[in-house]
């Protein structure tokens, strides 16, 4: 029997029309780990306030990045599976499961039902309850109802892994020029999620180094990722900035906000930036539309000149090698 490798990601609508996007957002936003309110307030918020207004706007955003091959997140993920399966040969059987949408986690686990062991790899370098935690919970809830449960290994995060850092840096390096400032833009989460992770402080600027109390702190893991990438890329502390994007609603999210950091950079005389999104392993709405289109327009309106968005790792050979190493180390 082969070992099973389950790759997990967030998901994508089936297509870019309003109906498909609304169905996707409904599944996503009613997840109690994403909007961590009691059930009734959460459903009122989602059904009455968010879905009616956000669905058309989100559909328009998806349409701006949709290709003949469909969703970039989906086809990059599928290409990753194909190339990784070729690299790992018969040692593993690999399946892709999306937390929301298709292919579902249930479908992916059904493909791996004959595997005697299962390695679960959420494709989120930094741990968060809303993404990693939700995907793992969904996976384990399905397995809990099976007659035969395989031996299980979970790779909770990999932000500190040298293979990930080196792969990310190699993809970024060709885009970095001498007179460019580097902006690391991570997906944001509400501040309250940081406190719920066990971290008892929310640092006003950068985060403290990783230690026992903040080892599951998403913000601390992001800052550590930036530090490791800067070291690999030989960037000085004045040559890069860390910020957080994609905030939703009026509650405080972790800071600094990507869309507010641009004015600060401009005020310092910075005109040219390279933006990398290290919390995303595959290009998607948040990288291609939010950063590649909207953030670039904002930068130019503020007086910025050159704006370069580096691609995510997608199905890059260095990323394939990194996953091989991370997974094989489990055995």
UniProtKB/Swiss-Prot annotation:
Pfam families the record matches: Ferrochelatase (PF00762)
CDD domains assigned: Ferrochelatase_C, Ferrochelatase_N
Superkingdom to which the source organism belongs: Bacteria
Single Gene Ontology BP annotation: heme biosynthetic process
Subcellular location field: Cytoplasm
Keyword annotations from UniProtKB, A to Z: Cytoplasm, Heme biosynthesis, Iron, Lyase, Metal-binding, Porphyrin biosynthesis
Keyword Transferase: no
GO CC field: cytoplasm
Enzyme Commission code: 4.98.1.1
Pathway(s) annotated for this protein in UniProt: Porphyrin-containing compound metabolism; protoheme biosynthesis; protoheme from protoporphyrin-IX: step 1/1
Gene Ontology molecular function: any one: metal ion binding
UniProt binding sites for Fe cation: 187, 286
Enzyme kind, highest EC tier: lyase
Protein's UniProt keywords contain Transcription regulation: no
Primary subcellular site in the record, as a coarse category: cytoplasm
Function field: Catalyzes the ferrous insertion into protoporphyrin IX.
Family: Belongs to the ferrochelatase family.
Name of the protein described by the UniProt record: Ferrochelatase
Organism per entry: Legionella pneumophila (strain Lens)
Lineage of origin: Bacteria, Pseudomonadati, Pseudomonadota, Gammaproteobacteria, Legionellales
